[in-house]
Amino acid sequence: AKQAGANEVAVFASASETFSRKNINCSIEGSLARYELVCRKAAKEGVPVRGYVSCIIACPYEGPVTPEAVCRVATSLIRMGCREISLGDTIGRATPDHVTVLLDAILEVIPPEKIAGHFHDTYGRSLDCIRTSLERGIRVFDSSVGGAGGCPFAPGAKGNVATHEVVQMLVTEGYSTGIDARALQKATSFMEQILGRQP
């Protein structure tokens, strides 16, 4: 990856055993063992690693996921050297109440500056979940141009929350994003054309 010009790598873990096996073809423990080797090698090469935890609220196969399960995986990733942990609501089931309970647990063991939010907009609640995360001190959020994305092992789940919607909400609420709104609009229109969506 470094030879190809990548200046950061990502590792994808899951708080759900079944989703881990479906998505990356190994157990949670097996994935963490692999990622420890990745983090060790990345540290030697001076390459930062970002950790992702899927299914932080619910799993499409197992149902509800406990905050304790999420904390176990997230803290393992931090201990092995991940610079930041992105908490992924893979199937978009999160509500603000879910996010509050989870962050109350996570922030006991990991500081907010090492946490990012990753919300899918399956049920139209992602912006509310971001607002709740902001109240808890989270300042980094994943999004995608035009709301594109998804996962073949998360049936029915929509893509990530749309970048332009997140930026509009943040600006309205007084946050600075550093994002060029005009360039973002062009990128969004381009993506909607590719996906065959009406603007």
Model regions: which residues?
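Catalytic cores and adjacent flexible loops of soluble metabolic enzymes
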Residues: 2-199
